[in-house]
Every structure is written in C-alpha cells, then in structure tokens.
UniProtKB/Swiss-Prot annotation:
Signal peptide: none annotated. Catalyzes the cleavage of L-kynurenine (L-Kyn) and L-3-hydroxykynurenine (L-3OHKyn) into anthranilic acid (AA) and 3-hydroxyanthranilic acid (3-OHAA), respectively. Pfam families: Aminotran_5 (PF00266), KYNU_C (PF22580). This is Kynureninase. InterPro entries: Aminotrans_V_dom, Kynureninase, PyrdxlP-dep_Trfase, PyrdxlP-dep_Trfase_major, PyrdxlP-dep_Trfase_small. Belongs to the kynureninase family. Its cofactor is pyridoxal 5'-phosphate. GO terms for biological process: 'de novo' NAD biosynthetic process from L-tryptophan; anthranilate metabolic process; L-kynurenine catabolic process; L-tryptophan catabolic process to kynurenine; quinolinate biosynthetic process. It catalyses: L-kynurenine + H2O = anthranilate + L-alanine + H(+); 3-hydroxy-L-kynurenine + H2O = 3-hydroxyanthranilate + L-alanine + H(+). The gene is kynu. Its main location: cytoplasm.
C-alpha cells in the first residue's frame, strides 16, 4: 500500500486534538520531530541580514524562511573549525602538511568516500569526489558515450537543466553527429507537467536500438519530479543502452540505491542538499561492474594512477580500479573539508530518516497551499485572492522535498513581496517558484510561517497587477 504522508498528518492532528492548519499543530509536529536538533548544526540566516527586506513588515531578529536548500544548502557550523585547522597546519608546516599532521592532504578525498557511498547506496570503490558537476558529466561521457554508426543517440528528458543539455550537445557534436537530430527528448503529454514513466519506457523501446546513452536527472530541477530510476535503468540496459544520471537535486534529498539499481554512472554537485558551500566539489559514481575495465577510454591524469607508484613519476598510467581511476588532479583540500563538515551532520542521522521527515514536511506545505490558495478554494474563487497551482507530482514517491508552484499573478511580484518579509527561495523563469523545505534544518513552523507570509504578500497584489 502506498505511503501517504498527508493521511499521517491528519491522523496526528486528530490524535493531538489540534487543527491541522493551526500554528499549534506545526509546533506539535516540531516537538515530535526526531531531527529537530539538526537545525542547531547549521548557521541559519536571520531576517535582518538579508538584502531587500522591509523591516517595517517583519521582525529583523527572527530567523528567515530559508526554503532554498535545493539551490544552496546552509553552512554547517563545523566548517570553520575544519578550515581553520588546515589553515593553521599550512601556516606551520607548508608542503609537509600533505603527509603529516591533522588530516593529511594527500589522501584528503578518503574522508568523503564512506559517508557519500552511504548516502547514494554505493560501494566505496564506486564513489569519488572530484571536479564540478558538468565537468564530471563530460568525464563520464568519455567512456560511456561511445557512438557507433548504429548507436549514436542520447535520450534525455525535455527541458533538462541547461548545463546538461550543453554537455550532451557538445559531446554529440564532438563525435560528428547532429545534436538537433541525435538527441531525443521526452516531454510531458499536452496539459501535463510531469513525465509519465510509461512514456519514457516507450521512447526507450522505440528508439533503443539507435540510443547509446540514456542521460536523465534523478530529480528534475524545474518540476521537482523524482524519476523511477530503477525501472528506467533496467529498461534502457535491456535495450543495450548505457544509463547515466544527473543527481544534483537527488543526493541528500531522496533515497538512492545506485549499486543495486545497476546504474552505469552518475554525477552530482554537493552544494545543494549536501551543504558543501558555493561551487563545492562534486561527486561521481561508476558502477563496480566497470571497475576493472581498464580498456574504457578516459581523459586521464596523475591522480587516477595507483597511489603506490604515483610519485615515482612513471610514464605508464596504472589506473586505480573503480571511480577513483577517473580523477585527474588532486582535489581541492578546503572544498573537501567543507563537504566533510556537512557529512559529519549526515552521519548523525540517515537518508531514510531525512526522507521520512521530508515527506511529511512537503506534504504539510502542500496541504496548507491547497487549503488556502487552491484554484477551487472558496476564497480564491471570488477572483480577489491569487491562487496557486502545484506542478510537482502529487504522489510522494515521485518527488523529493521541492514543490514547484505557479501563481495566477506574476511570479516576480509574489517573489518580491515574499523577499521583503524574509523569504529565501528562487524562481525559474518563465513562471515557476521553487519552494524546498530541507528536512535537516527546516521545521513545520517554518512552513506555517511561510503560508502566513504568502497570504500577506497576496494581500498586496491584485489579480491584474
């Protein structure tokens, strides 16, 4: 039977004898939240420190409503200590810090592997921290996009994140093919916002014999849809396709089992739900089944060579088995430490716990949005109050913590009014606002405050404004 977090919320409201739309119920949910203390692990922005806030409308000493962890996660409190310790070591030891003292720099990536492998459902040999997301997509397409006269196409979701599109287009063009013809895109049906799994599978079945790579997002950046990765991967591989995933909006947000799902490769950034800071080091996954296939082409560098011989400066490339063999250069130490500070927080809980809270938190946001601002609501029917439409799938298994919404009034105006009141989120043009309460540091009270804030913003906006 499908899990329905909205039903759980209603049962808890009934059990507590509290009105589900009341602030008291939100506070009750926070009091029962096993992750409630995780917020203390992060620096949380205050209203008065944000640009564009109108302090005549809001208490500047309050916490902001930060629903933008899908764009940039908050700073873990442990970051500064780790960075300061390494700066001090650099100050005191210079180059000797590579091999001596606290947390030697030479094997720095090792401090990231086990916790990241746990988060994505992988083995240690399958995971590496390196580069940035789009760079890693290119690095992975060297071995895994190898077109032939018979198989040369790439299958993607329509309106994928632009950088993914550019990477795929440039790879197709580099190999002498036509991106306009040889990248197949799957779009939602007319009148629908999300892709149906059956339509993705139909495209694989129809074009599979000419497709060499299926490259999708785990969670779609615009709509927030969480694709059925296991089913899509199996169907594509059955047709002889390689399968890769951009997990930028999935890692740290939804449960992943990349090894068990037999995914060929995946790439992700770490500055969203993994809270590694702006431009933080990215991650990559290469399935164990490819670990010892040293014949796969790659763009090689010395950090992908065997550690025991790396500094012997041999001409021969002795590839490290697994994902680590795809490294080119030594990773940026301070970026690794920033990510480690966040992984320390993740190790105090589990993705299962994070996902469980995220389901409830997002369901509560959805419930309140529909209660007050649904197009069919009696309040909005009179035409004087703007209404909200949610384009993210309603089924919790088909989404993470992000809800993408559209308004009956200009999104820029709504966003401006929210920002005046201490909201941090983002808009994606032409007309979507992304609202993403992050389970590690957001609360049910945050959700309730946001709804009150949205109501106040709507009161300043007329339907024709």
């Amino acid at each position: 039977m499908a899990y329905k977090p909205t039903q759980t919320l209603r049962k808890l409201a009934e059990k507590s004898s509290l009105d589900i739309v009341s602030r008291e119920f939100a506070d009750y949910m926070d009091s029962k939240d096993p992750l409630r203390k995780m917020r203390d692990e992060f620096f949380y922005p205050r209203v008065k420190d944000l640009p564009g806030v109108d302090l005549s409308l809001v208490d500047g000493d309050q916490d902001s409503i930060y629903f933008c962890g899908n764009s940039l996660g908050l700073q873990p409190r442990g970051c500064r200590e780790l960075i300061d310790r390494s700066l001090t070591k650099w100050e005191q030891m210079g180059v000797l810090g590579h091999t001596s003292g606290w947390c030697p720099w030479k094997p720095i990536e090792d401090i990231l592997i086990k916790p990241m492998a746990e988060i994505i459902g992988a083995k240690d040999i399958e995971v590496v921290a390196m580069n940035t997301l789009t760079v890693n997509l290119h690095m992975m397409m060297v071995p895994f996009y190898r077109p032939t006269p018979q198989r040369y196409k790439i299958l993607m979701e329509g309106k994928a994140f632009p950088s993914d599109q550019y990477a795929a287009q440039s790879q197709v063009h580099f190999h002498g093919f036509d991106p306009d013809k040889d990248i197949i895109e799957v779009f939602p049906r007319e009148g629908e916002q999300s892709l149906r799994t059956e339509d993705i599978l139909s495209a694989i079945e129809e074009h599979g014999n000419s497709i060499t790579l299926v490259l999708f997002s785990g969670v779609q950046y615009y709509t927030g849809q969480f694709f059925d990765m296991k089913t899509i991967t199996a169907a594509a591989q059955k047709k002889g396709c390689v399968v890769g995933w951009d997990l930028a909006h999935a890692v740290g947000n939804v449960e992943l089992h990349l090894h068990d799902w037999n995914v060929d490769f995946a790439c992700w950034c770490t500055y969203k739900y993994l809270n590694s800071g702006p431009g933080g080091i990215a991650g990559a996954f290469v399935h164990e089944k490819h670990a010892y296939n040293f014949e796969l082409p790659k763009f090689a560098g010395w950090w992908g060579t065997d550690r025991n011989s790396r500094f012997q400066m041999r001409k021969e490339f002795e590839q490290i088995p697994g994902a680590h063999g795809y490294q080119c250069s030594n990773p940026p130490v301070f970026q690794c430490l920033l990510l480690r500070a966040s992984l320390d927080v993740f190790e105090k809980t589990s993705v299962k716990e994070i996902r469980a809270k995220g389901d409830l938190l997002t369901a509560y946001l959805e419930l309140l949005l529909l209660h007050y601002f649904s197009p069919s609501n009696d309040i909005t029917k009179n035409g004087n109050t703007p209404h909200v439409s949610i384009i993210t799938p309603a089924d919790p298994k088909d989404r993470g913590c992000q809800l993408s919404v559209k308004f009956s009034v200009p999104v820029d105006k709504v966003f401006e009014e929210l920002c005046k009141r201490g909201f941090v989120g983002d808009i994606r043009h032409p007309d979507v606002m992304r609202i993403a309460p992050a389970p590690l540091y957001n609360s049910f009270a945050d959700v309730h405050r946001f709804i009150s804030m949205l109501n106040a913003a709507f009161k300043t906006i007329t339907p024709n404004s």
